[in-house]
């Protein structure tokens, strides 16, 4: 049950909030009590609060007394309806001062003892409530009726015994020195006329407390101590509240005054307000479960719980928005954040157990750094990439490729001498870069020494793994490039071999069996040369590769290259046949060399026979290429090869064991028909040359007398031509040379005056040149006229 209104007297310095149930009749904790403390602002007061609890018989006026002392509003019994249980379980109210510098007060009203409604279970609840009140309170009020003093049950003797035993249990587990529980005995319906207050005090102290102390069994360390060593005891006599309300109010003020003078400035249990509910809940839960109530352990548990709560809240707040950090500002930002977080944490956690708060504080800083692991990796990613690129550059420089010349060079040397050390160099560079990264990462070690001393090293393994991956990727690019060059070397060796094959195909004595035996031997020799020259190179480029692997690879590549070359040959088969025919038909051997055939010296029969033989010999190539030969492939286990290996697919793909694809009959027929036409054209050309050689006489066969007659008859014409040529080609150049020589010499000797001598000479030379040119034209015209008249003269 909860009242809806807060109670405040205008003359009072405090505000009392409506009570809220802490534990119900079944001893179950009410979570609403925590919300009640939160909403009231109680969790912000720190240690500036006190706790007051009350114990006493049912219907003894406990709630009324608390209402009178603290201006509270606990529910009280309606006597007009008879005596019955009013307060069930444990209820709590909060008294807040209007002056925030004054301590607040938590007031607990517990269910009365000796309850008929509880029946046989009342003793269990009495023990629980007593232990709970003693564990929490700065002061425990024991409410007694004056008329019941001396009675065993009515005087709460059993309750007091429980209180002493429970307090002894608490003190025995508490390590704090001078730990005393304050007990306020409020004797109700007392009057000076009944008994002096001193007598009542002595009675309570001797007949109750000391008597109980002597009865109970105590730990050895308390055997020689009195009850006063554990309790601070005050006894108050309270007048009847109904018949003497003014005196009752006066007596209550005396109790309140004493409380104000005795209450500690801060909560004596050293539990801060924000952890009070958790502490209270754990204490009650431990009591209910009938476990040993260890107050230091409870405080440590509370400290651990609250510090963890503070840690979680601060950690979440600090990592909500983390900016993108570069390598240069990462450490500065992190140290600034650690200082801020540590200061914020200890501003709240310092109220709890120092050992626990420091331990959780270190956990906070460690977890905060852990939250920055992705940020750390991101900030250092650029440096890792830089190392990877640098390693690639160093390796590329170490194995510089120069293919501009006729021969491939790697690091200015033959590749076969350099490639064997490739993988070893890769490992050395990778190890060097990894060490370089480790040295660089050591600068990011966190050393923190403020309230707590703390060191943290970020996990460098992800960055190292990333570096290894990047470096391996960069190296694989270079490795693939060099493996490609190695493949080119294999292809080049095969192509060089095939030049010899093509020359062999032009041999006139070519036969099927001899050619394929020759090619088989040549192929084996080429494969052996590849193994001898390139095995160590391959093993250097592909780390831990076996000799058998390269033997298989080189065999596969050579077979593919052979098939490719034979395919190219078949694509150009017509041209090759024409070359064979041309060689056999148009050329003949002379002193060990091929020379063109002199067709004009050949007879028609010889030409026909030569054509027939050359054609047959040329087409022999088709018979050779209609056959092929197989190469026995050794067994090879592909499981021994890594799947990311450059040549994995090459080694895994099915390869034909045949050197070539045989020429089909249809293709051979088509090529034969096409070539026959061109053979015929070459034959006809030879016939033309032969016929021309027999019909046209050579100039060497003309008799010498013919040349003598020609000279005599044409002498006049020859003389005229020579005369013209002599004058035109000799005199004119001499005039030009004379003019320029005279002009140059005169200018050198006479300077500006030379012009008066040069000009007349120039004019004279020009006039002579004009006259000679005119004579040359007239002479040519005259010769042309004579020639024309000679042609028109009738024959006699």
UniProtKB/Swiss-Prot annotation:
It comes from the Eukaryota. One of its GO terms (cellular component) is endoplasmic reticulum membrane. Its EC number is 3.6.5.-. Pfam families: RHD3_GTPase, Sey1_3HB. Its main location: endoplasmic reticulum. Residues 46-280 form the GB1/RHD3-type G domain. It is found in: Endoplasmic reticulum membrane. Residues 554-626 form a coiled coil. It is a multi-pass membrane protein. GTP binds at residues 56-63. One of its GO terms (biological process) is endoplasmic reticulum membrane fusion. Keywords: Coiled coil, Endoplasmic reticulum, GTP-binding, Hydrolase, Membrane, Nucleotide-binding, Transmembrane, Transmembrane helix. InterPro entries: G_GB1_RHD3_dom (IPR030386), P-loop_NTPase (IPR027417), RHD3/Sey1 (IPR008803), Sey1/RHD3-like_3HB (IPR046758). Residues 723-725 are lumenal. GO terms for molecular function: GTP binding; GTPase activity. Residues 1-701, 747-796 are cytoplasmic. PROSITE patterns: G_GB1_RHD3 (PS51715). The chain crosses the membrane at residues 702-722, 726-746. Probable GTP-binding protein that may be involved in cell development. Belongs to the TRAFAC class dynamin-like GTPase superfamily. GB1/RHD3 GTPase family. RHD3 subfamily. PANTHER family: PROTEIN SEY1 (PTHR45923:SF2). This is Protein SEY1 homolog. It comes from Theileria parva (East coast fever infection agent).
